Amino acid sequence: MIIDPERVAKIMRETAEIDVLPRFQKLSESEIMEKAPGDIVTVADYDAEKRLTAALKDLLPGADILAEEAASRDGLDLEDYQSARTTWLIDPVDGTRNFSKGEPTFAIVIALVKGGQT
């Protein structure tokens, strides 16, 4: 299994252009929610995660996906994926608090893990 990093980078760029950057410094209060006390999420997180999940499933069919917002909702964590299976790890907007405040310190983070190795 060889994944071209440029294909992953393209998916990340497209997601940033469509779901994240158009909302930067433009979020309304109703687009920022608290998923747990002190832990916020935005519509950009949800939309970006949905797009990234679909694109990465297409790129590597059969791989598991552990995405931050779905994992938070479903009560999953990395320990649930400690196996030889291939798993995409997704943080659709790493630095959500900064993003929600209009501070330019955030990123889309993706890792591919197989047998505990990235």
Where are the regions that the model predicts?
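N-terminal subdomain of lithium-sensitive/metallo-dependent phosphomonoesterases centered on the IMPase/IPPase/PAP
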Residues: 1-90
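DPxDG-like acidic metal-binding loop motif
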Residues: 80-118
